[in-house]
């Protein structure tokens, strides 16, 4: 391409390229609205074919570093760099593109399109040796970086993505590899972000993001691998967040966030491995919380954040914080959509025992037995009620002592007022109402009173009742103690 074939605006860019000088077409500086770029005239319009020619075979000056640095231009046509190898940095900020650039399979040292307006962007399977900066860009079409390798940071701060279709993604980052951070605080999307299979060596920052895709995925990040933190503080998400099979080495922080996807899951984090999961200081999730088969080292979960329906089957956590009374944690287990999940109760009890709160652990185990009772047949429920009333399933042993003392007082008083007659007056020992009642109550121990005396009338029925009650009490005590000892 000859310089004589270029417009005055293009000639400025051509001449500046060899020395890496910046060409700024803006008239209002940073206050200019790039969205009005469709109205810009030829004095600031650059053909995409000219930019392509510069990047692939532009002039070079010995001792200078060539670079494409343009601000405030209207780029017409498609910037086609498919499978190209570009050795100059590309800096096209505050620009208005008529067509989506296509850099699929390209190899670049650095790409900066900040504050630009684009109808889309294709950088699939590309390699960028430095960073990709899309800060404050506005996209009206799909941005596709799937399969790309970025050696630096991917910047998406306050970028905006408009809906393309009702179900399709607006930002495709599937299987992308980022050797540094994915920095996207204040991101705005109307559609799905697809981050499945991606690998981020640093952290992912989505703080203050506004993600909108009602009834569908706002963030689908299945099998995502993050070596640092996944930060989503103060996020407002309308739609579901999916992290099935993801691995987050650091903290997954949803503090102060509002997640809303009524009648479906708001957070799907099944089969995840997470260092720390923070769900705190926000309103209750509007939608289900799915943590099935997840493994979390530290679960920071405030009871106020838990939604009306959860999935906690096979969830494993080492530490549960903040420390709350068992009465505030148990409702979460009762909201499990799968009904009675014994593993969830065992996990909670283990977490309490780990911090030395044995009382709370016993309350959880008691609640587990009561929940199990509700799943049994009528005779199983009846036996459960007996165990609960007598010894609290073995977790309230003092209750057995109260029953024993109460029955002992009733029997002793009754037989003290009306002595049963001796079976053999010459051989009978002196009658003692207390030990006679103990003989009736205790199935194994004998004080010689029961065999020597026989009550009559309703006192005989009282004796039968004491014997039956004693056997029931002894059986429930043995069952409860066995359950407690085996658990220890």
Model-identified regions with their sequence ranges:
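Hydrophobic alpha-helical transmembrane segments
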Residues: 342-356, 404-422, 445
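Transmembrane alpha-helical segments and their cytosolic interface motifs
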Residues: 377-418, 427
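Transmembrane alpha-helical segments in integral membrane proteins
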Residues: 412, 462-488
């Amino acid at each position: 391409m000859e310089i004589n074939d270029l417009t005055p605006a293009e000639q400025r860019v051509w001449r500046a390229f060899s020395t890496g000088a910046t060409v700024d077409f803006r008239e209002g500086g940073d206050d200019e609205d790039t969205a009005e770029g469709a109205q810009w005239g030829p004095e600031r319009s650059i053909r995409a074919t000219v930019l392509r020619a510069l990047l692939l075979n532009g002039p070079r000056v010995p001792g200078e570093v060539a670079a494409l640095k343009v601000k405030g231009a209207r780029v017409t046509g498609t910037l086609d760099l498919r499978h190209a190898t570009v050795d100059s940095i590309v800096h096209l900020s505050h620009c208005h593109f008529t067509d989506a650039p296509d850099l699929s399979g390209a190899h670049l040292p650095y790409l900066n399109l900040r504050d630009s307006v684009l109808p889309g962007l294709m950088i699939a399977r590309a390699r960028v040796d430095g960073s990709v900066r899309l800060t404050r860009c506005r996209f009206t079409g799909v941005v596709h970086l799937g399969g790309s390798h970025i050696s630096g940071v991917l910047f998406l701060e306050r970028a905006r993505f408009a809906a393309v279709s009702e179900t399709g993604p607006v930002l495709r980052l599937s299987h992308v590899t980022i050797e540094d951070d994915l920095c996207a605080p204040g991101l705005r999307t109307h559609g799905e972000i697809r981050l499945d299979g991606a690998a981020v060596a640093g952290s992912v920052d989505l703080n203050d993001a506004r993600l909108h895709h009602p009834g569908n995925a706002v963030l689908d990040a299945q099998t995502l691998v993050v070596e640092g933190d996944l930060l989503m503080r103060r996020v407002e998400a309308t739609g579901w967040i999916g992290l099935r099979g993801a691995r987050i080495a650091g903290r997954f922080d949803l503090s102060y966030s509002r997640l809303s996807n009524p009648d479906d899951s708001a957070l799907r984090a099944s089969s995840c491995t997470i260092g720390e999961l923070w769900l705190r200081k926000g309103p209750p999730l509007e939608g289900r919380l799915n943590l099935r088969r997840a493994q979390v080292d530290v679960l920071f979960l405030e009871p106020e954040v838990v939604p009306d329906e959860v999935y906690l089957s096979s969830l494993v956590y080492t530490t549960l914080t903040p420390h709350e009374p068992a009465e505030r944690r148990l409702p979460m287990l009762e909201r499990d959509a799968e009904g009675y999940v014994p593993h969830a109760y065992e996990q909670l009890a283990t977490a309490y025992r780990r911090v030395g709160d044995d009382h709370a652990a016993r309350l959880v185990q008691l609640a587990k037995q009561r929940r199990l009772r509700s799943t049994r047949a009528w005779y199983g429920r009846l036996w459960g009620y007996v165990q609960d009333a007598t010894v609290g399933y073995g977790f309230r042993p003092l209750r057995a002592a109260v029953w024993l003392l109460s029955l002992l007082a009733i029997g002793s008083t009754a037989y003290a007022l009306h002595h049963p007659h001796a079976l053999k007056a010459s051989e009978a020992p002196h009658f003692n109402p207390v030990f006679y009642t103990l003989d009736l109550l205790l199935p194994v121990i004998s004080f010689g009173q029961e065999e020597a005396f026989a009550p009559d009338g309703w006192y005989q029925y009282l004796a039968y009742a004491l014997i039956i009650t004693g056997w029931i009490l002894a059986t429930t005590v043995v069952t409860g103690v066995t359950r407690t000892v085996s658990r220890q």
